[in-house]
């Protein structure tokens, strides 16, 4: 069985991997594991998402060192693209790039920073939560 890990920014993305992507992948002989990045820890518990890129970088480095993962994915939304992340300077609106162009530039910057051929980044233009609410509003959820 193939093993894929996906670094996600929060609980919604973790649920998406566990309840949507995971079952679909398992029908193809692939096991998908979500890993939620911890951006800070306090006495009241861990915080996930947002934060600085250093937390994502450390976790990605660790996951890429593990040779048993056939693929190492990254699922981020454009709105919460972390401070200090590769390509962050192109993430702000400009006249030269539309949203799709910025998304493409971010993923290119991520692949350049982590050239491991197993690495597969995805920067989603809209928050996963917004897509879920849109599906519910459309009568599909």
Regions found by a protein language model. Name each.
Residues 1-70:
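Short, surface-exposed loop/strand segments
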Residues 5, 73, 120-122:
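A structural signal for isolated positions on well-ordered beta-strands in alpha/beta enzyme cores
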Residues 9-10, 74, 132:
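Short, conserved catalytic/metal-binding motifs centered on acidic residues
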Residues 15-19, 23, 27-28, 32, ...:
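Generic local-structure boundary detector
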Residues 77-141:
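Activity-critical C-terminal alpha-helical subdomain
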């Amino acid at each position: 069985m193939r093993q894929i890990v996906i670094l996600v920014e929060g609980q919604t993305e973790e649920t998406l991997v566990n309840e949507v992507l995971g079952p679909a992948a398992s029908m193809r002989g692939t096991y998908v594991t979500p890993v939620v990045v911890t951006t800070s820890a306090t006495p009241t518990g861990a915080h996930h998402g947002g934060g600085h890129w250093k937390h994502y970088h450390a976790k990605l480095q660790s996951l890429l060192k593990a040779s048993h993962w056939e693929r190492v994915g990254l699922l981020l939304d454009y709105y919460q693209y972390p401070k200090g992340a590769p390509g962050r300077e192109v993430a702000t609106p400009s006249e030269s790039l539309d949203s799709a162009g910025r998304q493409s530039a971010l993923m290119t910057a991520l692949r350049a920073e982590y050239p491991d051929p197993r690495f597969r980044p995805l920067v989603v233009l809209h928050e996963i939560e917004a897509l879920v609410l849109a599906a519910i509003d459309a009568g599909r959820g």
